[in-house]
Amino acid sequence: MKKITSAALIALLVLATGNVLASSPLSKETQQNKSITQVDAFFPRVEGSFVGDPMPVYADGLFNIFYLNDVRGGSDLGVHAIHLLSSANLYHYQNQSEVIPYVNDVNDPELLLGTGSIIKVGDTWHAWYTAHNENVFPVESVMHATSKDRLHWVKHPQDTLLPGDNYRGNDFRDPHVVWVEEKKEYWMLITTRSNGRGIIARYSSTDLKNWHDRGVFFDNDTITSNANLECPTLVFFNGRWYLSFSDQWPLRLTQYRVADNPEGPWRKLDNYVVDGSGFYAGKLTIKDDRLFVFGWIPTKAGNSDNASIDWAGNLVGHELAADANGELSSLIPQELQAVIHDNPGPVHTLMPVKTLQTATQFAPLQSALYPPLPSKGELVATVNIPSSGMVMSFGLNDDNVSKATLNVVFNKSKGKVYFFNSPLETINQHNAESWIDVPLGEQVELRVLIQDSIAVFYINNKAAFSTRMYSMPEKPWSISLPQHDSFHATLKIKVMI
């Protein structure tokens, strides 16, 4: 009997059904990735790669975080295969590694994969994702794959969705598919451009194969109408519809809008973000009537605080709670809180090792210095701010607080928290790297998750603020208040082991 090679078998399969097994030769980087099966972290990534645009879906008792795997300086021409991290508690992650590969061919549309969405319908998982290749036209298109176990996928190139005449072929990506019960149909939201504006288009389907262009779903209402609205999601939560996206420029914020109906009209609330610009590409998902958002905290070139921001980094997830008006607050997920509580690591009460006066160009300050934070832990703090606010400075060299360049500023009068990557003594002459709006009263309640160079501040059970600070580990830090304020603070640190 004549043997049929695997390549010939795949070719026959394509000719017969149009389907393609989602497999390819493994690069050395992917082989290394597959050898790492477990990651225990607040903000996971698999060693040797970084987490790009996540595609979260909760099913069968697990948070399944599909994401674009970023290998820097990899041996392949292709980039951003879709990988999977899964977890029940958002701390102990199983690394399923590569599940949907790129095609390592400069002439194939799937040379570079972009984000999309995954849903489970019956016993079948469906993935829609972006194919990107500047050597072909259109540069971007939407691909479809299915799986019975979420690990082994079959691609369906015959289901490829190309940009319509009204949309820009270089920007047609990030498909998000959702079942809309009121309409008895599936909707696909797509990041694209029309008439020079960044918009979200909508397609509809009743069978997940045949899609119909329904035009502009959401027109750009951000401060720059030509910005792309990336990574959209649409969910029904707490009696309302929520649309989220991340503006590609200039703010790079994961934003949300609220509506009573899936077609809108969409309201932009006073607080319309889930985090600052230290968090990007956030996508929403539901677990048992609870809402979550997953995005990534970027690294910086050369692991330097002064360098440019990279694409991709570490995964981060917040739980979101809605008030009576639909405004969302960002919280530590309950699952992660339980892990922290049950971890046998020690809890220490923190006391200042020294207090001193700090001179700045804007006001004299009093500063309390604290010992270095653990490489992984939770800081719980209550600090009184009787007048204008406070500053938390990290990565101190000796006792020189005024020279500290990593500063989180709580501005009470403006109701804002800022992250400055500039010296405290001249901070009034610099622009903040990121910021969020959050009401600040006489007291600040903080829970800060620390992991190596990452600190995510959860403020007053209201807001999350993600930061990357490479000079923070193994160095003292401080809290500073105006010189004549009374200093009252209670701080505890839980060390994760």
Which residue ranges define each predicted feature?
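Beta-strand-rich interaction surfaces with strong enrichment in secreted/lumenal proteins
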Residues: 270-271, 366-372, 433-438, 467-468
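Bacterial N-terminal signal peptides
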Residues: 8-16
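Bacterial N-terminal signal peptides that target proteins for export
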Residues: 1-8
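Beta-rich carbohydrate-recognition and catalytic domains
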Residues: 23-174, 179-225, 236-276, 297-355, ...
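Ligand-recognition surfaces built from glycine- and aromatic
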Residues: 469-497
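Carbohydrate-binding surfaces in secreted/extracellular proteins
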Residues: 381, 444-467
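Secretory/extracellular carbohydrate-interaction modules
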Residues: 358-421
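Short, aromatic/His-centered strand-loop micro-motif at the edge of beta-sheets
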Residues: 423-445
